[in-house]
């Protein structure tokens, strides 16, 4: 099943997004993984493109646009939006989804749903937290660079104008979810109804807290095994 995740960021460091996309990171601690010499390690495989900017100058391009319109100056303003499309792990084996094709779908999705924005589109093959699924990151500057034709999903007249900010509402989010579902159906990929409310939702903070707890238990169990114990500790599901 393909799912869509959204993260809004108030950080003015647009370069951090690019660094995350191209370098290996510890997903739990949100820190880069370093080699024995203290250097960051490039991800094994990724596909990267820029929309309305060169991908490796995304930081400078966003800062320049912000200065031009005198926007995103307040520390409490949302500077960027990060959308993540996670495809079902079965799609790579059952439906022949490749990283190259996922990148093409991500570019199609970003162009259709975030027109006029500077954006990074990057596909990772390694999965999140060992899940093994192909996923696409779309990071956009919250400030729109170009005037674009008015689209049905745009709720305000200024939502198609340069110099105005990305405005995510519940209806817009539903449109984004439906857009992803439509692509998956067209491509014969595994998909669930994203518009149906989930019976059980876990926040990102709760998820990572549980993951860290499991890692600590794993370390404790290794110590117990080293001391000759055979009765190990477990967490409840």
Regions found by a protein language model. Name each.
Residues 1-236:
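N-terminal nicking endonuclease/strand-transfer module with a His-rich metal-binding environment
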